UniProtKB/Swiss-Prot annotation:
Protein name, as recorded: Thiazole synthase
Coiled-coil region list: none
Binding site for 1-deoxy-D-xylulose 5-phosphate: 163, 189-190, 211-212
Gene3D superfamilies: Aldolase class I
Gene Ontology molecular-function annotations: thiazole synthase activity
Native species: Novosphingobium aromaticivorans (strain ATCC 700278 / DSM 12444 / CCUG 56034 / CIP 105152 / NBRC 16084 / F199)
């Protein structure tokens, strides 16, 4: 059973669930809210440019997912320059008072890989303005350290391209990021199914963020529940410490004293 005292902290805020879920691609707000509940997530990430969180004349996500119970993490999805991302998060802070934010500055529409030069520049500006940026980045330990130095409160390397469902393509570099970071590390993007979420946690990550894997499942609510259990299982496996790998067999029962 997962230890309820096994919490994680980002920017002075402590959480029990290590699964962060998105709010895009769902059939409607009702389904989104049900998936969040099934996942056990305490944080949801919201695309400021796409999801209504401030216009009371239109359906609002906050009517379905209570911001008093769930932490909202505004993100800059769809931004391709540092200026766009900074402006978007300034608007988010004006609308809802949010300072803990998710920064992503994309390099191109085909791969949705981050533009790290623009990302680092935006991180520096946002940190100076009092934001607490959790930052989407490439799976590169050097880039992750640069982001940390620039003021990132968490680094979020991609496992694979956003929405691809390809799973974690480079376990070695993700592990290196975990080993070198002094801030939380969360895999962001690429997870497609529960086993891949477990892998992220087994690598020592502090958490996993996902959207498409749940929203595009045939049964999003069931998948949300599966992801919750997978993240817990992966974390427990990491804390337990896996057995060493061996070249040859090692019998489970002693060979001495056989009849």
């Amino acid at each position: 059973m997962t230890d309820n005292n096994d919490t994680w902290t980002v920017a002075g805020r402590t959480f029990t669930s290590r699964l962060i879920v998105g709010t895009g691609k769902y059939k409607d707000f009702e389904q989104n809210a049900a998936a969040v509940e099934a996942s056990g997530a305490e944080i949801v990430t919201v695309a400021v440019r796409r999801v209504n969180v401030s216009d009371p004349k239109a359906p609002m996500l906050t009517d379905y997912i209570d911001p008093k119970k769930i932490t909202y993490l505004p993100n800059t999805a769809g931004c391709f320059t540092a200026e766009d991302a900074i402006r978007t998060l300034r608007l988010a802070r004006e609308a809802g008072g949010w300072d803990l934010v998710k920064l992503e500055v994309l390099g191109e529409a085909r791969t949705l890989y981050p533009n790290m030069i623009e990302t680092i520049r935006a991180t520096e500006v946002l940190a100076k303005e009092g934001f607490l940026p959790m930052v989407y980045c490439v799976d590169d330990p050097i880039a992750a350290k640069q982001l940390e130095d620039a003021g990132a409160v968490a680094v979020m390397p991609l496992g694979a391209p956003i929405g691809s469902g390809l799973g974690i393509q480079n376990k070695v570099t993700v592990r290196l990021i975990v080993e070198g970071a002094k801030v939380p590390v969360l895999v962001d993007a690429g997870v497609g199914t529960a086993s891949e979420a477990a892998v992220a946690m087994e690598l020592g990550c502090d958490g996993v963020l996902m959207n498409t894997a749940i929203a595009e499942a045939k049964d999003p609510i069931r998948m949300a529940r599966a992801m919750k259990l997978a993240v817990q299982a992966g974390r427990d496996a990491y804390l337990a410490g896996r057995m060493p790998t061996r070249k040859y067999a090692d019998p489970s029962s002693p060979l001495a004293g056989l009849i």
